[in-house]
Amino acid sequence: MVERVSGKTHTDDDGAARSSRRATVAKPRAKTATQDKFTKKTIALVYDFDGTLSPKPMQEYAFLPKLGVKAEDFWAECTRVAKAERADPLITYMHLMYKKAKEKGLRVDRKDLVAQGRDVELYQGVESWFGEIERYVKALPGAKGVTVKHYLVSSGLTEIIEGTKIYKHFANVFASEYWFDAYELPFPKRVITDTGKTQYLFRINKGIEDLGESINSHMDEDARPIPFANMVYFGDGETDVPSMALLKKNGGHAIAVHSPLARSDSPSSSRARPLGSPPAGERAAAQNGLKKCMELFAAGRCDFYAPADYRKGSDLFKRTCLLIDRMVADIRVQEERSALG
């Protein structure tokens, strides 16, 4: 049996372990005389996955190799079929994953996809990033009472993400997902599109993370537990533009990341570039990623851009901490104003 709680999915046998770290979501209540006047002290760091926390699409690490299918051929077919059928590209890739597996006589089930998450490669420093950010905030003067929550919003597969080493660090994961008991076939239960990602930013903002609840009802800004101004979105390209634009328009923040393989004119860029000579195709893709980040920055879609090096002391870490400093200062200003009545 598969149990659904908020945006995460898990089986009964691991429910106890996961429930201990599950985000507690409650509808905002009216303040009482005994409550603090200002309670919006939560900062939300929201991440894309493919290309942001991991160098490649998650399907390329285990699923496609298991089928003996080249990644470039699979994605080209997805694009071709989606255009020919006038279909959603994300539903198309989820359909083709099952179709290819069936052709090979392989069964696609939840347990196998979760296991594939163990093979997903992460950028340097990602595993230690969450702890380093927590330690930074705890040591930050004026950050008493401020907490940081990490969220994942991805068009990738929830099942594969659950198998990664970093799943435990997220307060909630909103990603595409299969429905495995639909006519005894895997069927897309939820698809997270580029523009659809913004729905989940509103869910975080309003504190309505249970996907069974509508977010369309009006909620006053004062009643929303995590203001957009307390959010930072991390993404790597065009698919993240709607999310970046939403946050920037509402006082929030965004950081664009690119492969550390890319070369830039920044003196610090060489620190993040790994040794060795990567294939020409990877270098070209990395340069295109850097170019896209520069375009996003020039267009005002992000506050900063940096190599996807998540180690403490990297450009990405330092620039994220600058935004945290700013948000903490804003929280303190609002808290002081609230105390004045």
Regions from the PLM with identified roles:
Residues M1-T32:
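Polybasic, lysine-enriched low-complexity intrinsically disordered terminal tails
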Residues K27-A182, G300-D303:
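Alpha-helical substrate-recognition element adjacent to the catalytic core
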Residues R118-Y151, S155-G341:
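C-terminal cap/substrate-recognition subdomain and adjoining C-terminal extension
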Residues S6-K8, T42-A44, N230, F234:
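Generic secretory/membrane-interface signal
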